[in-house]
Amino acid sequence: AQNCAFEVVSEILGDCCYAGGASANDAVQTSRLDRFTMLVSDLYPEALWHKYYTGIYRCNKFFEKIDGAAFEDEDLRAMYKAEGHFLRAYYYFDLVRLFGNVPLILTPLTPADFAQKQAEPAAVYEQIATDLLTAIGMKRADGSPAMTEAANQFDSADKGRATLDAAKALLCRVWLYYTGYY
């Protein structure tokens, strides 16, 4: 369910969810989605929330540890940091589009810190743009971009990595959503 949660939850913005079957109890979550009465405890939004905040936690933990890690190749460290900023921006972009006000967490939390206040979408979009601009602006030692420019420059083992082009495209999409043109 977690792999299709985004596609299902994003349908609340449209009118494409229909429960199918013989009774009113068939696909109850889908029926609630169609009637705009989705609960936060329903599988789809809960799975998305968990998936994205797990990714954000991992990015934040990564940022906390990366500078203390030993690297033989500093260009690799720069690439990983740029990819981390891209991923955190990606996770927050989906969260803010689907849920509006969400907690904006930029450091790893302990269980004592779990009760976080929700941030206004403007603050979340600002952080998304900051993360993407950071990813785009990170450089290797020779001054070239830290991220690989395009997906076709990867060998098969690295397909799916974040690229400079992906970061620029996501930034454009973020600005379109935030300014209301999309």
Question: Whereabouts are the PLM-identified features?
Answer:
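TPR/Sel1-like alpha-solenoid repeat signature
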Residues: 85, 168-174
